[in-house]
Amino acid sequence: MPSLSVVPLMPPWLRWLCGLVLAIALGVGLCRLIAESLWFHQLGYLEVVWQRWSVQALLFLAVAGVSQLFYGCQQQWLLRQRTVTLDPALRAQSTYRGLGLWQLLLCAGSLNWLLIVATYHIGAIALQLWQQRSEMTFNSPLLPQLSVWRVAELSLQMVQTPWLLGLSLVAVILGLWLPVGLFQGLGILLSLAMGAIASLSWPVVLKGLFAASDPHTEPLFRHSISFYLFQIPLWELLRLWLVNLSVVGLGGTTLGYLLANESLSHGKFLGFVRSQRRHLQGLSAFVFATVALSFWLERYKLLYSTKGAAFGAGYTDVTVRLPLYGWLSASAFGVACLLAWSAIRRGGEQRRLGPIAPGLFGFTLGYLGVILIVDWLLPTAIEAAIVQPNQLQRELPYIQRTITHTREGFNLEKMRVEPFQPENNLNAEILAANAATTRNIRLWDTRPLLETNRQLQQLRSYYRFPAAFLDRYSLKLAPDQDQSEIRQVLIAAREVDYSAVQQFARSWINEHLVFTHGYGFTMSPVNTAEANGLPKYFVRDIGDTGQLLVNPPQIRESISFFYPRIYYGELTNTYIFVPSEVPELDFPRGTENVYNHYDGTGGVPIASWWRRLVYSVYFRDWQLLLTPNLRPDSRVLFRRLIQDRVRAIAPFLRFDSEPYLVVADPRSEQEIAPRPSTAGVNYLYWMIDAYTVSRYYPYSDPGEHSFNYIRNSVKVVVDAYNGDVTFYVVEPEDVMIRTWQRIFPTLFHPLSAMPHQLYRHIRYPIDLLQVQSEQLLKYHMSDPVVFYNREDLWQIPKEIYREKPQAVAPYYLITKLPIGATEEFILLVPFTPVNRPNLIGWLAARSDGENYGKLLLYVFPKQELVFGPEQMEARINQDPVISQQISLWNRQGSRSVQGNLLIIPIQRSLLYVEPIYLEADQNRLPTLARVIVMDNQRIVMAPTLEEALKQLFPQ
């Protein structure tokens, strides 16, 4: 019989197969690494991504390696101690009764189940982080910790999932048969999963290590805000690792000792010998040390409590839970020290049988009982007996903390609050003095404009207008006009959508070589329409020479947009190879097409055979290797969706849902990118707002959001032709962006480096103001007594759109604020009291120049009745002339659509404007039919805004 040392582990063919699979996997991984590196290098961010990848690899190797080393040491010690032979005489002399068969099965089965639940727990977290790796929650991941309650929750979830239950039962049976094998297998899985969690949590680690200081402190522990934003998440990650490491180590080792010496066959477990007890005591000390760490961290988590009268630590948290958590932490640490001393001290009978440690089981049960009392019974009793009878007095200082820190977390503490006493004295003279406001009142909503664009401006079936963007431009509109005037316009990019190409025309060449880019855009004034009710266009169509058509011609003196090709946009989801031997479709001209070749700097050169091989593997596209259509100067352009592009570079930022197109000529002043460019002329850029967010700002109430801290700290500019991406810091005082600047010093640029022609188009983001306005509904109340009684709750009013009520969204307008010297571009949202329709105030976010980012809250006197949107909608529906006309339209094969109701502040008065669109039942082409204009007393409807204003305010 051959010795085991010469028996092959596997047949040769299987070794070759495994080697081949491993080689293919390594080859694919290497190709992906090279492809991504070339992409980042072309953009100038190779150093940034290599730093990130290095940290991720180091974290994975360190955490997975240390975890496996720990488990491996426990398993080796376990295997050595399992061979201890028990003397029959020693068994007879032992006073320890041990465990009977059923007790042994119960203990072993429970330990098996605990190991499986712990593995499932870590695996679920790793999977969740992988799925959320490009989302905002990835920046501050919420890590559920392993606890008694978590084990119960996961057990219930596993029992209710048939395949999980079946797999778990098989693992339990396997653990009873091969306990050490199960421990080894689960140890490997847990090590890999924890390594993955650490690697995916690289932002948490880097922020914790490179945290910038913040002068602000919270009032309970007096720690810097930086400690909570950066250190607490890092400690939570460390806690997750250590708790699972210790629990699985103790559980797996205990299981191995319980089932040693054929205890199941004998139907009895006689006890642990001294060496086994010392091993288990050391592991128990590790467990209690992690328990001490957990309760130490739970003290800080009281700052995010939801159990009091307001968010954050309340009276019961501070007076009861805080000291008891400290006691629990100290006592657990004391037990850990005693167990560690017991494990390392010498002496005692090495073969004496007994439990792990006398009294440890009873102490653990008592400790769990104390936890139950501390977490539920005692706080509930204190709350009912002491707090509830005098809750306002008890909770008052803590409510004030919540108000202050919530306003800080959502950047509302610098908001300026002003009274707004409505004068209701609008007249023709005042309107003439505010002509810049009235000529920029928005009549066209984005939805009807896009519908019109899709029918009139798409030109071909493969073009799309995915969105329309509101912005302001300085334009010359008349030949004799000396100076430009600020006009609010709607811009929509004409992008190519390959999914809209006819099925018979789809081919590899068309997808990757021909349909490569969109062309042009439309620009419409917001306040007027043509005589037939269709939108008026400043910029439209595509001329025979490729120039966009403009009206009036003076527009060309204000905006440069020659050959506006869009290679990077919101619909560009294909990878392309340009230039190539196959001409690219440039733009349609009548019944024919005009073709072109890309001459920009975007993309990765792909002429060499090895780069073709790399990218054919990367894209899983074998035709790339075989095509004869590539040239020596061909480049591959991929990741062309602008959202994907910026996320790949800075996945730790949260990006706004609405990138917007800017038409500008920054090269007349300086380069858009900090490196030389030889690109062809381009004037189209995408601007994207980026946010730093966290859920760890102390005492800050997140409301309905997954974060309680947000700053619009970064503006991102993407070249629509060359694909260059530049990050500009808008809010340098933000502690989170200062931390990221310390981590990636070459990634960000100061706002002063942004070309002026682009800087003029930065705007306060709608997403941010929506979040802030939602928080302001409750947290505008600065008096804690008023806040506690909910005396002055606000709400976002509703308007009627397409016959359905909807919340009024923040909207842009150009107006002169009561404290302003000139008209400016602002973002406005109105408020009404809860359950009351009258207007109570409005919030304005400023976007121009040095006033960018400043918030102004105008509050109406409570005794003054100011009509809100719902009341104005009711007035429209009740007006006999208007309702009769709308009914007539609806009976004539058409349908009237009420647009957004806008509230326009002009000096100390309010003007209400709502457009009425008309749609035919057949083609659904919306036209502007009427404009309704109102003040506090009168209401008129006319074909144009100018006529309506003249009727409402005659000379």
UniProtKB/Swiss-Prot annotation:
It comes from the Bacteria. It is a multi-pass membrane protein. The keyword Nucleotide-binding does not apply. One of its GO terms (cellular component) is plasma membrane. Belongs to the UPF0182 family. The chain crosses the membrane at residues 6-26, 53-73, 98-118, 163-183, 186-206, 240-260, 280-300, 324-344, 354-374. This is UPF0182 protein tll1193. It holds the Pfam family UPF0182. It is found in: Cell membrane. Keywords: Cell membrane, Membrane, Transmembrane, Transmembrane helix.
